[in-house]
Amino acid sequence: MIEIDGSFGEGGGQILRTSLTLSVITGKPFRIFNIRANRPNPGLQRQHLWAVKAMKMISNAETKGDEVGSKELIFVPHEIKGNTNIDIDVGTAGSVTLIIQTVLPAIINKNVRIRIKGGTDVPKSPTIDYIRLVYLEILRKIGIEAKLNLIKRGHYPEGGGEVIIENVNGNPSAFSLLELGKLTIIKGISHVSSLPAHIAERQMNSAREILSKLGVPIEIQTDVRQGEVSKGSGIALAAIGEKSIIGADSLGERGKRAEIVGEEAARILIDNLNTKASVDIHMSDMLMIFASLYGGEYIGAELTSHAYTNMEIIKKFLDIKIDVSGKRPFRFKAKIF
């Protein structure tokens, strides 16, 4: 059984999520201890438990220690169950997108349909529009297709969002994403839920003003939804090059003007573009598991503590070599074979 110290590296939930994904894919059981030991609320929290429960349902796994506050978990997966529907409710504003990242690599070509309820646009995780505009589009470039249906948005703290992920199929193989290529267009989605529509317009216009100096077409849509459980706003942007995509997002909050939200996302996007990387900070982390499974190389905008921790966890499950050139927290090249 693979032993994992949950306090290693950044010491957060990413260690657990990566372990769950690779355990289900490889069939290797693991024991993780010191879960989130150095965090303000140590041990498993509700949203971490739903990642465990989701992967448990997918693989008919045996578990021990899967309860709120537990600092140790044993996870023994069995064969992945295909042709099935799974419902996951992470509660209030638990992150839907972190669940998507955990389950998606394990359900490729398995005909699994997953309905996830919780927070679609919440702090400390990619927004659902980032997932749609950037994450899924980059996966398409490496041979993985997925259908994501956004039914309801959920913001912190009430949540109430709902998405369905299905038709995750493909024939992924070794890939090389070493440059963005010529920038062709910037796409985006500016949204509001149960708030005045002009907020989405102001976010969009603010971002557009800053991005106009890049000299490429800008297509930002607005998504205005009234009657949602939670109130909130945000914007996600995708700079689409001939070979890859760079993304960024920003969320509104009480007291934060809509213009600041749009400006923030635009400046983050430009900062990532200026690194000359092939993928942004979010994808620098998220692409690593796919490069590890299929072989791949890419240039990430920043070698974060998440990415570094991911490398070490991945090597516990897979017999691979990870060659990284670059120093934290700067641009880096990852080659995995």
Curated annotation (Swiss-Prot):
> Which keywords annotate this record?
ATP-binding, Cytoplasm, Ligase, Nucleotide-binding
Principal cellular location given in the protein's record: cytoplasm
Reaction catalysed? a 3'-end 3'-phospho-ribonucleotide-RNA + ATP = a 3'-end 2',3'-cyclophospho-ribonucleotide-RNA + AMP + diphosphate
Question: Where does the record place it?
Answer: Cytoplasm
| Cited PROSITE patterns | RTC
Q: Name one Pfam family in it.
A: RTC_insert
> Catalytic residues per the record?
H306 (tele-amp-histidine intermediate)
Signal peptide as annotated in the record: none
Its GO CC terms are: cytoplasm
E.C. code: 6.5.1.4
Q: Which GO terms describe its biological process?
A: RNA processing
Function description: Catalyzes the conversion of 3'-phosphate to a 2',3'-cyclic phosphodiester at the end of RNA. The mechanism of action of the enzyme occurs in 3 steps: (A) adenylation of the enzyme by ATP; (B) transfer of adenylate to an RNA-N3'P to produce RNA-N3'PP5'A; (C) and attack of the adjacent 2'-hydroxyl on the 3'-phosphorus in the diester linkage to produce the cyclic end product. The biological role of this enzyme is unknown but it is likely to function in some aspects of cellular RNA processing.
- UniProt name for this protein: RNA 3'-terminal phosphate cyclase
